[in-house]
């Protein structure tokens, strides 16, 4: 013990000589943030260089569409630091990015496992992504890439709807899926299964047995979603990457490992309003990244999440800052309160789903209808499945 104290005293003495813990030189000696995987490291200088390079690239157009909507979610379950209002509706947003050549990159793909939507969740307004794109004047046949922010069921559910598109997925995300395929749902005499489907006070079944993992990370990867992802990887339609990856000039993937899942990733897009950064659930709420709030603590490493916030702040620092951070589940999406999504409308024949035009490149015509339907969500909620439940 004495030796340990002496070593500690020696170290503290050296720190004092060097100028203390806050010394600029000390900080310069370790410029990398405390990220857990080497390929996830990106310094501020590296990120700013990506911005400078991207600003010389062609400009992209961007939209989002609402794949579906969670209803009446307890606010503190989504953002523990926020409790007003006590319940919120959360969209499930998909990014659509069009390059000057007309090719389209999707960021996420929404969901398709309708049993999750209408049986196991209080949700509404589902519509197939291809139908949504056609309804707003975009050709699904032009989709050549899908960048998967992460592989959960509400984000990776419609990959197979775009058979010619190549999916960009982090090696770390596949590692997480592999791990969770053997997750011990029945461990300890079925305790995990029991606490998720049985009311401990009455002993009554309160959820379907298939939902037994609802509070464990494995539930993000149900069989249908795993099939969607593995279908692409085994079918030669996936590009498995490890960290930062430049798809094209002005279109760059940045790792956000453990920010939400093992292999979460951001997508930087060069536009006329600066760099947009799509974040999926790494910053599932724009108000979260704006106000530096924890989100979705059940499946998030908070330190890595905040490091992802920092990446978006740096990438958007030259123009519009965090207003250019695009989240998947921001409750104020499709309102003036989330400025970049304020040019929104209800998708025609879209089962009450919505779209927003974020920014147009020069020469791209608007896709907003001449007389857009902006019926408030409270007056347009469809909880009816558009076709029979898919098990």
Each model region followed by its residue ranges:
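Active-site metal-binding motif and surrounding structural segment of the metallo-beta-lactamase
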Residues: 120-169
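Bacterial N-terminal signal peptides
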Residues: 9-20
């Amino acid at each position: 013990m004495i030796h340990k104290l002496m070593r500690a005293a020696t170290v503290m003495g050296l720190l004092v000589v060097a100028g203390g813990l806050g010394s600029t030189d000390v900080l310069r000696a370790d410029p990398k943030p405390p990220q857990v995987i080497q390929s996830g490291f990106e310094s501020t200088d590296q990120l700013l260089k990506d911005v400078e390079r991207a600003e010389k690239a062609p400009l992209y157009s961007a939209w989002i569409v609402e794949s579906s909507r969670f209803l009446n979610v307890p606010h503190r379950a989504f953002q523990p630091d926020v409790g007003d209002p006590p319940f919120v509706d959360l969209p499930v947003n998909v990014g659509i990015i069009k390059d000057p050549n007309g090719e389209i990159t999707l960021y996420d793909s929404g969901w398709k496992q309708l049993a999750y939507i209408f049986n196991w969740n209080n949700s509404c307004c589902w519509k197939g992504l291809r139908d949504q794109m056609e309804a707003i004047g975009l050709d699904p046949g032009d989709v050549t890439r899908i960048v998967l922010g992460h592989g959960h069921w509400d984000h990776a559910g419609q990959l197979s709807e775009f058979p010619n598109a190549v999916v960009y997925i982090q090696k770390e995300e596949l590692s997480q899926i592999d791990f969770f395929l053997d997750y011990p749902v029945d461990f300890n005499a079925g305790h995990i299964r029991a606490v998720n489907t049985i009311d401990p006070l009455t002993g009554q079944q309160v959820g379907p047995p298939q939902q037994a993992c609802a509070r464990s990370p494995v539930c993000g990867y149900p069989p249908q979603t795993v099939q969607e992802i593995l279908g692409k990887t085994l079918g030669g339609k996936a590009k498995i990457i490890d960290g930062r990856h430049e798809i094209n000039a002005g279109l760059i993937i940045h790792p956000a490992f453990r920010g939400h899942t093992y292999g979460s990733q951001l997508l930087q897009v060069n536009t006329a309003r600066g760099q947009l950064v799509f974040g999926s659930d790494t910053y599932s709420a724009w108000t979260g990244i704006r106000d530096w709030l924890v989100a979705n603590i059940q499946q998030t490493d908070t330190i890595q999440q905040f490091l992802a916030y920092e990446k978006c702040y740096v990438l958007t620092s030259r123009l519009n800052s965090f207003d250019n951070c695009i989240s998947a589940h921001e409750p104020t999406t499709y309102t003036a309160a989330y400025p970049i999504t304020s040019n929104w409308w209800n998708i025609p024949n879209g089962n009450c789903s919505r779209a927003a035009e974020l920014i147009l490149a020069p020469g791209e015509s608007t896709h907003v209808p001449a007389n857009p339907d902006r019926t408030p969500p409270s007056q347009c909620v469809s909880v009816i499945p558009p076709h029979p439940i898919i098990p």
